[in-house]
Amino acid sequence: SVTGETTPGLYAQYTYKLGEKLTVMPGVRWDHSDRYGSFVTPRLHVKYSPAKIITLRALAGKGFRSPHALAENVTLLASGRDVTVSPDLKQEEAWNMGASVSMNIPMFGKILELNEEYYYTDFLNQTIINFDGAKGAHTLSFENLDGKSYSHTFQVDATYPLFSGMTVTAAFRLNDVKCTYDGVLRQKPLTSRYKGLLTLSYKTPLELWQFDVTGQLNGDGELYDRSRYPAYFQLQAQVTREFRKFSLYVGGENLTNYKIDNPILHSHHPWTSAFDATQVWGPVTGAMAYIGIRYKLEKL
C-alpha cells in the first residue's frame, strides 16, 4: 500500500445553463502521482427541471484512488488470521454513473416529497480483501482484483405530512454488490442486500412536545465462509420536551432487543488463528434507554 505519495493536479470545468430548466457541467481533471504516473478523470453532471414539481439529475465519470490497505482496515486486525498484503497493489480505478428523480407531488392538499435514485460503479482495478481464500483457512489477504467487481444501488424515499404536526418518512434501498474472489464472482461479505426505514414524527400544536418512532429493517447477507446471516428488525423511539433555552429528551434504542448470539468467533481461544471479532453483522447489545439535555446558546 501507499506509504507516501505526492499528486499535483489540474482541474477544468464548464457550466452551461439554459434558463432555470437545464444545467450541464462537464469537467476533467489531470493528476500526476509520483507512484502511479499520470491519469485523467472526466466527469459530467446534468440537472433538468421540466416542471416545478420534478427535477432530474444524472452523473457519470471516472475515479482513481490510492490504496492504504492496513490503515483503512484496522478493525480487520481484530482476529487471529494470518495477514498478507500484496507488494504491488495497483491504484484503484472505476467508472461510476447514476441518476435521480426528485418530485414534489400535490396530494390531498399537501405535498408528497418523493425521491428515487440509482447508482452503478464498475471497478477496473480494486484492492480486494480475501478471507480464507487460496492462501488457506484463517487467512486475510489484500490483493488486486482479478475479475469483475461492481455495485448497483437503488433507493426510494418519501416524506408526507399526514396531518398537522405528523410527518411520515419511508425509505427502501436495494444493494447488489459483487466481487471476484479466487475466480468466483460472489456477494461482497457483510453487505446487506436491502434496508428499509419507516419514521413517524409528531409535534404538538405549540411544538412543546415531539414524539419520534423509527423502525429499521436490515437485510440478510453473506459471511466470509459464504454462510448467510438473517434479516432483522430494530425499533427506536424518542420523546422531546422543548423549553425556552433547552430541551430534554428521553428515548430507547434497539427496543426489539435483537442481538447476535455469538458475535466473536472462538472467543474462548483468543490466541488461535480461529479467533475472529471481525464478523459482527448486527447489534451486540440489547435494548438501551437514554436521557439527555440540549442547551441553546444565545447568539454572540
Place the predicted regions along the sequence by residue.
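Surface-exposed extracellular loop regions of Gram-negative outer-membrane beta-barrel proteins
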Residues: 2-33, 39-43, 160, 164-173
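Transmembrane beta-strands of outer-membrane beta-barrel pores
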Residues: 6-8, 28-34, 60-66, 73-75, ...
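Residues on the lipid-exposed face of transmembrane beta-strands in outer-membrane beta-barrel proteins
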Residues: 10-16, 44-48, 99-103, 156-160, ...
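Outer-membrane beta-barrel strand-turn architecture
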Residues: 16-20, 24, 40, 48-52, ...
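Gram-negative outer-membrane beta-barrel transporters
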Residues: 17-21, 114-122, 144-223, 294-299
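Transmembrane beta-strands of outer-membrane beta-barrel proteins
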Residues: 24-26, 56-58, 97, 112-116, ...
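Membrane-embedded beta-barrel scaffold of Gram-negative outer-membrane proteins
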Residues: 49-51, 55-57, 90-144, 150
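C-terminal beta-signal and adjacent terminal beta-strands/loops
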Residues: 168, 239-300
